[in-house]
Curated annotation (Swiss-Prot):
Gene3D superfamilies: P-loop containing nucleotide triphosphate hydrolases (3.40.50.300)
Entry keyword Protein biosynthesis: no
Name of the featured protein: Energy-coupling factor transporter ATP-binding protein EcfA1
InterPro entries membership: AAA+_ATPase (IPR003593), ABC_transporter-like_ATP-bd (IPR003439), ABC_transporter-like_CS (IPR017871), ABC_transpr_CbiO/EcfA_su (IPR015856), ECF_ABC_transporter_ATP-bd (IPR050095), EcfA_1 (IPR030947), P-loop_NTPase (IPR027417)
Gene: ecfA1
Listed EC numbers: 7.-.-.-
UniProt keyword annotations, A-Z: ATP-binding, Cell membrane, Membrane, Nucleotide-binding, Translocase, Transport
KW Iron (keyword) present: no
Length: 269
């Protein structure tokens, strides 16, 4: 399979957690564009988190294929390909493994047998990129939730991934910390040309994306740019998703397009 513009491709993927259970994913096909921000959105039970598990190998497909950089993922090559993908999970407390910040970032590098001098350089650079270098010696209980997620991103960046998956990574943060983290992710994507995949139930987060995949009941419900998705926003509420505030207001005002950021809403008003 040759697709130079996609980093990950799902082709007719189906999955069930138990052989006698209903399928969580049903004949799912989509492409993740290389170097872009893709948001995979859906309510609970839509299959979005299962997609993340398949991408990082926690689960294996029952039928269909997953390709990474044009290579079909198999048991033989998975470990090699997996090293190129980093993931940040929902609960920041569950992913902090070091006693202090810099040890947490170094943990993955130690597992990859990175030499000490190189490890020190990578840890410092990664913490600097997420504005946490001054807190390198802090214990986790001295950090806010948003700061812990920054450390989690630094731990991933230190491994030089091509893809970062955010699995509901902002869902436990307050609105300010959430927006700060999304701004950081946008900066990291731009500076390193990293592919971002955000798994979320929050359509506000999808507004940040270049490419949006909406999941419903284990199938792809809609796919396109954020503008394309929100220009037909009425269908999103029927599958249990809550529209972002500026789009709700824009619809109430009767404007032609549904897609609107907070800044755009202010301009309209």
């Amino acid at each position: 399979m040759e697709d130079k513009n996609s980093v990950i491709v799902f082709k007719n993927v189906s999955f069930q957690y138990q052989s006698d259970a209903s399928f969580t994913l049903k004949d799912v096909s989509f492409n993740i564009p290389k170097g872009q921000w893709t948001s995979i959105v859906g309510h609970n039970g839509s299959g979005k988190s299962t997609i993340a598990k398949l991408m990082i190998g926690i689960e294996k497909v029952k039928s269909g294929e997953i390709f990474y950089n044009n290579q079909a993922i198999t048991d033989d090559n998975f470990e090699k390909l997996r090293k190129d993908i980093g993931i940040v999970f929902q609960n920041p407390d569950n992913q902090f493994v070091g006693s202090i910040v810099k040890y947490d970032v170094a943990f993955g590098l130690e597992n990859h047998a990175v030499p000490h001098d190189e490890m020190h350089r990578r840890v410092s650079e990664a913490l600097k990129q997420v504005d946490m270098l001054e807190r390198a010696d802090y214990e986790p209980n001295a950090l806010s939730g948003g700061q812990k997620q920054r450390v989690a991103i630094a731990s991933v960046l230190a491994l030089n991934p091509s893809v970062i998956i955010l699995d509901e990574a902002t869902s436990m943060l307050d609105p300010d910390a959430r927006q700060n983290l999304l701004d950081l992710v946008r900066k990291v994507k731009s500076e390193h040309n990293i592919t971002i995949i955000s798994i979320t139930h929050d359509l506000s987060e999808a507004m940040e994306a270049d490419h949006v995949i909406v999941m419903n009941k284990g199938t792809v419900y809609k796919e396109g740019t954020a503008i394309e998705i929100f220009d037909h926003a009425e269908g999103l509420t029927t599958i249990g998703l809550d529209l972002p505030f500026p789009i709700k207001i824009n619809q109430m005002l009767g404007h032609q397009t549904s897609f609107l950021t907070y800044e755009g809403l202010v301009d309209q008003l």
